Amino acid sequence: MTSVGLAPVSGLRESSSHSVGVDRLPEEMNDMRIRDDKEIEAAIVDGNGTETGHIIVTTIGGRHGQPKQTISYMAERIVGQGSFGVVFQAKCLETGETVAIKKVLQDKRYKNRELQTMRLLDHPNVVCLKHCFFSTTEKDEVYLNLVLEYVPETVHRVIKHYNKLNQRMPLILVKLYTYQIFRALSYIHHTIGVCHRDIKPQNLLVNPHTHQVKLCDFGSAKVLVKGEPNISYICSRYYRAPELIFGATEYTTAIDIWSAGCVLAELLLGQPLFPGESGVDQLVEIIKVLGTPTREEIKCMNPNYNEFKFPQIKAHPWHKIFHKRMPPEAVDLVSRLLQYSPNLRCTALEAVTHAFFDELRDPNTRLPNGRVLPPLFNFKAHELKGVSAENLLKLVPEHARKQCPSLGL
């Protein structure tokens, strides 16, 4: 285990010692490894390490003959807070690179599932884990700090930006954002086997210059095993699939598809499609649009749900929910995503091949500011495993095939 210090900065109380020993962590924590064995610990003794100007010094390397390297992060500002802990923006003093550090209280009895998941992820549309370290407080609490790439904006804030201007988001951005969401979901669902369980605009990061989207916050993510129960109270309101509202515990990755459908509808409308303060409110909003679910649909969502006391309401036609000038492909994709029966929803990869995204496959398409689109077709072979030859040619348009030499197209 390493021994590291906290570098005092002006305006902060200097600790009595410049080098603070880190308590030995429980054995199960010692087993945790991330890509490239970059596991680090740091001791924090002055406050919680997230105040502006606070400096955290950590050591990486030292394994397999690698030289030890000191990395110092200066906390700049808090960018997110919740029941999980805190996310703060920080700057690496050695390189000048800006990062996001997610700091969560670590229960010593368990491995951290978010860290275990993030170790597996490597995709252009998923936020990248750079490394991690543990920190301890004076109260002997252990915190896990995930050092992540910093992406300055969220889809949520982009929606708010256009609402303030009283404008609809340009359709090219709607296509660009949702295409990348489905690419990320296809990767985590089929390559990694993980369900995110909290897809919402706040968890979709956007680079405002390139419009590249990255899925973040894997704090609720889980590998779903058939036959094993899961908690139904996950996913944020407005984006919760109906089977979760019905209390299903044997759900599938189709809950993420429903959430992504809600995000797409919100980008098109400028407001949530199914607002509701409670599960019942939410269900009422869904029924107003999709109509009352049939007995068969309820059985598909939760076989144990026998109460059937809903008012009989007819489905509201999708073309009446959206503006009459809305492209029919957009309406068609929303209708394929927002199905009561989880097994009738299209998969993430099927969504990526949908005609709604054909404009993105046109080599002449540009961003509203005239710039080229971010990389959209840099697939790796494992992402397209089992894809038919016909769909393969659709997924990787001719002009982009040199981006994927390993696919042999």
UniProtKB/Swiss-Prot annotation:
Family matches, as InterPro entries: GSK-3, Kinase-like_dom_sf, Prot_kinase_dom, Protein_kinase_ATP_BS, Ser/Thr_kinase_AS, STKc_GSK3
A single GO molecular function term of this UniProt record: protein serine/threonine kinase activity
Post-translational modifications reported in the UniProt record: Autophosphorylated mainly on threonine and serine residues.
Gene3D superfamilies attached to this UniProt entry: Phosphorylase Kinase, domain 1, Transferase(Phosphotransferase) domain 1
Residue ranges of every copy of the Protein kinase domain listed in the record: 73-357
Catalytic activity field: L-seryl-[protein] + ATP = O-phospho-L-seryl-[protein] + ADP + H(+); L-threonyl-[protein] + ATP = O-phospho-L-threonyl-[protein] + ADP + H(+)
GO BP, one annotated term: signal transduction
Known role: May mediate extracellular signals to regulate transcription in differentiating cells.
Protein name: Shaggy-related protein kinase NtK-1
